[in-house]
């Protein structure tokens, strides 16, 4: 095992000099002899000097300190022993519940599955959230992004999806908290514990307070655990269907941006690292379904300043099967989940996959809402009275649809006081189809606000009269 000495420290970036004949490879993990801090090699600068990123705080480091090469990338524990536990980027438990009971470990840097190993699926994953199931349905083994600016409900939506899918899902889940609030990580842990599904979830946290090196790699640690569960074969030679939640993928990009300039790279558009697309691709190409097992991933994506054309969310879009866009305009109307029904898309929105009825209802809802959007300027200037009877009817139905797309969440019960609702897909389709066909034109629009199925709207209308 070769040893080197620290020659330069700039924030999270540390340069280490090794003997010329014992230079470590890129991505090798180095360990500081004095305090056990892990460094990951990023570049070979020549003359025996390597540039590394610290996985923890670089406070207190001095030039001349001894560093040992472990000869391998960062490896983390995997397997059943990680379930119900919280680990950090290095796989070290941080929940004060003793060491992790597993003898298996894996390097966090793995090659993506080969093209002939991949498998595609068109089986739908019911979420119980009306707007998602109707307009941007998820596929089992697919990739979903929840896009939104600050405070429009990405984490709450993700928690509700975890509540509806992970609890009903008999398989295993991995949750990677990348650069988010520690409080949310804590809430998630207790939510899982109270629901008695903690023994099916592995949690990997690298929260906001961690140095950039830690946040840059914590998503890979979580993914490595999920990949192991996917690839581990049972007696029939089949892998598992794993759920992989990431909150938030933007912080992964941001951590790369923070260290990019320190690594000596020229910044690209908006100050992002020039390797943005490659870094994102390396992570996303591993989150995939193979012929052995599947990973269904749900990723929250922060949108800086609500600008979807920002390079970070724009790069993420290319990798996803379904995009759920959360809108501040819809949130300001008090409609939650604040999903934009016209911006959100899914590859599954196809009559060959969904069936003709679901497809027709979804497109009918979107065209009604689009027509309403076009008429809003006229209404603002001239008022409703200037519209034709047909347009008045369209506006009335669109406003009912808009309100019916809202839904009380289980995870928000403590804030709203309304019990959460899970709506089956067939009830969702039947409800919207009836509104489009004019069966509920006689009901007031507030009857459709924050209810589950259409029957609840009818009951609510009785109390309003």
Swiss-Prot record:
SUPFAM superfamilies the record matches: C-terminal domain of alpha and beta subunits of F1 ATP synthase (SSF47917), N-terminal domain of alpha and beta subunits of F1 ATP synthase (SSF50615), P-loop containing nucleoside triphosphate hydrolases (SSF52540)
GO cellular component terms, A-Z: plasma membrane; proton-transporting ATP synthase complex
Quaternary structure annotation from Swiss-Prot or TrEMBL: F-type ATPases have 2 components, CF(1) - the catalytic core - and CF(0) - the membrane proton channel. CF(1) has five subunits: alpha(3), beta(3), gamma(1), delta(1), epsilon(1). CF(0) has three main subunits: a(1), b(2) and c(9-12). The alpha and beta chains form an alternating ring which encloses part of the gamma chain. CF(1) is attached to CF(0) by a central stalk formed by the gamma and epsilon chains, while a peripheral stalk is formed by the delta and b chains.
Annotated gene: atpD
A GO MF label: ATP binding
Cited function: Produces ATP from ADP in the presence of a proton gradient across the membrane. The catalytic sites are hosted primarily by the beta subunits.
Protein name, UniProt field: ATP synthase subunit beta
Subcellular location: Cell inner membrane
Binding site for ATP: 148-155
Residue ranges that the Swiss-Prot or TrEMBL entry lists as coiled coil: none
Record-linked SMART domains: AAA (SM00382)
Superkingdom to which the source organism belongs: Bacteria
Organism classification: Bacteria, Pseudomonadati, Pseudomonadota, Betaproteobacteria, Neisseriales
InterPro entries: AAA+_ATPase (IPR003593), ATP-synt_VA_C (IPR055190), ATP_synth_F1_bsu (IPR005722), ATPase_a/bsu_AS (IPR020003), ATPase_alpha/beta_chains (IPR050053), ATPase_F1/V1/A1_a/bsu_N (IPR004100), ATPase_F1/V1/A1_a/bsu_N_sf (IPR036121), ATPase_F1/V1/A1_a/bsu_nucl-bd (IPR000194)
Organism whose genome encodes this protein: Neisseria meningitidis serogroup C / serotype 2a (strain ATCC 700532 / DSM 15464 / FAM18)
Keywords: ATP synthesis, ATP-binding, Cell inner membrane, Cell membrane, CF(1), Hydrogen ion transport, Ion transport, Membrane, Nucleotide-binding, Translocase, Transport
Family affiliation: Belongs to the ATPase alpha/beta chains family.
